Amino acid sequence: SQNATLRNILDAVYKMAVRKRKANESRPEGEKYAELQRVRLGSRLLAYLPLRITDELVGILRSFKDKASRVGVTQFIIQTHFQSPLEVTPEAKKAIEAILSAGWIITNQLVYTVAASGRGHKAKLRQTLNAMGVVCYYTFSVKGFHENYAVFAPNSRSLQEQQEEKVFGLIPKEKQKELYRLIRYERPLGKKLSGFLKENRLLFAATDRSVLNLPA
């Protein structure tokens, strides 16, 4: 989409948030509308076309965050889709830094295919993304039906990865609230997340949910 399209979409979202808040001023308790608290945009541009993340686009994101924060929106998320640490090019790093500078956070979803399920592959991806301030959101096992049978990794491999590889990034219980506050409130996140990992001697933060699907 063009920048103008994104600007129009975000303007519409902002106006909706304003309308709900205004309407709630005259509605009784128990009948108020649920107000907008989170905006999440899904895009794989960071992985396959990072040069699309221009100063103008980042400015649109920053401007929206500034005004939406004043009407109750507290979370601004770009959900992206890196499958391999090899996709994290210098251009991708620059794009990530630009978006983080606008006050948004970036989360990553991984589709757990055969190519992405090699020993140590996911651990390295977590480490690479965390080093730049990207939070791993979930690892998704596909169902293994006819349309994706040739590329799916079975649930057993995902379970093995959790027990033998993901375990090295588990956050100590006494540090979980600190990490939550960091991800939830600290902006820009990049160096702060790296500092947390270094301070706690962690290779990465295993924050991603491992989502299993049948009949895989």
Please identify what each model-predicted range represents.
Residues 1-2, 13, 99, 128-130:
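Conserved catalytic-core segments centered on acid/base and nucleophilic motifs
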Residues 46-48, 74-88, 95-96, 100-119, ...:
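Conserved strand-turn element in the central/C-terminal portion of the radical SAM core barrel
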Residues 7-14, 96, 123-126:
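Short, well-ordered alpha-helical packing segments
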Residues 123-216:
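Auxiliary Fe-S-binding modules of radical SAM enzymes
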Residues 56-59, 93-95, 120-125:
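Charged helix-capping and loop-helix junction motifs
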Residues 59-73, 101-102, 128-141:
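Structural recognition of alpha->loop->beta junctions
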Residues 1-71:
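Conserved Radical SAM active-site core
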